Amino acid sequence: MKIAVVGCNGAVGVTMLELLANTGHEVKCMASSRSANTKLKVGVSEYLISEFSVANCADCDIVFLCVSGAFSLEFGPKLAKSSCVIDNSSAFRYHDDVPLLVPPINGKTYRGERLIANPNCSSAIALMVLGPLHARYGLESVIVSTYQAASGAGRPAMQELVEKARAFEDYNRDNSGINFAHNLAFNVIPQVDNFESNGYTREEMKVVWELRKVLNLPELAVSTTAVRVPTLRSHAEALTLRFQDPVADLHAVRELLRNSPGVDLVDQPEQNQYPMPMTSTYKHAVEVGRIRHNLIYGEYGLDMFISGDQLLRGAALNAYEIMQLVADLPESASAQLHDPEPPRSEPASRLARAAHG
């Protein structure tokens, strides 16, 4: 297949290229005129960036849009006339005629549409766990608290966190932020995106809308609090769930999640083993642990903690799996995807280097 990655030099675009490496697909890298004719090195591969145009994508089977919502709104429908478009922005997620897909959860609902939306990172991570639990016990309500890494705001935000952390001397010395409302270093900020009229942020409402759409539960009770935390990569989430059916056997819950695709059970708290951004970074699966009955809902409720790499499972990997679905690729096509090994030989972390571009 011939594939275009538009916005190839952003955080999600680079991760997309990492997934496409060694797949045998012909990949076109596209970005704005500012980046055109420059080279982009991703792993051992080097790409020449072309200036984006609809005409340059016309011969592509798949176009990944790793760009802003405004860009996607303008060009997504035009590109869909000749290619299958997988959009990573929020531009089309809430359009009734555009599918919002998490393939392991609702892939069977795909009906051949040419424009497909990829969900918000926090939603995609949560849905990997919520999907199998809903299928077994029937979700009644979901309360989500997210702990979101700096990279969710893009590569410049990662760089800002690294620089602010290095320069940190004491609290109240510097509360300024460029990519955040405040200094994120050694701080947490209970704001991700702009505030809506109901007091929730746009990010929080995205989770509400997207859980309902993907699970096909338009009346599902959902409440979210999204918090930016000073980690570089991988989001974490605390979930409080209420079910229609009783969940008496926690062992059965753990076995259900252990055997669910894209889920890694990490639930041995007595050995200090539980989900963390430190361990879920670069991992394809979503970690889930701290599974316990909720003290308010009893056997009808569960509390748990999850963590997932929002650039992979929360964005690029889900988009890749959408491509597999729409192209009807065989199961063996996913066998070549492995969790990338973080570098061990270089003293500077991969994350810090990624933050500096």
Model-derived features: positions:
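Short aromatic/hydrophobic contact patches that present stacked aromatics
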Residues: 64, 238-240, 303-305
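Glycine-rich phosphate/pyrophosphate-binding beta-alpha loops
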Residues: 228-230, 309-313
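Contiguous C-terminal substrate-recognition/catalytic subdomains in enzyme active sites
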Residues: 178-279
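Active-site lining segments that contact anionic ligands and/or coordinate catalytic metals
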Residues: 236-238, 283-285, 299-301
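Helix-loop-beta segment of a Rossmann-like dinucleotide-binding subdomain
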Residues: 110-117, 187-198, 302-306
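A glycine-rich, Thr/Ser-enriched phosphate-binding loop motif common to dinucleotide/cofactor-binding enzymes
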Residues: 116-125, 199-208, 314-318
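N-terminal Rossmann-like NAD(P) cofactor-binding subdomain of oxidoreductases
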Residues: 1-184, 220-221, 255, 286-287, ...
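Short glycine-rich, acidic/polar surface loops and turns
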Residues: 272-279, 283-293
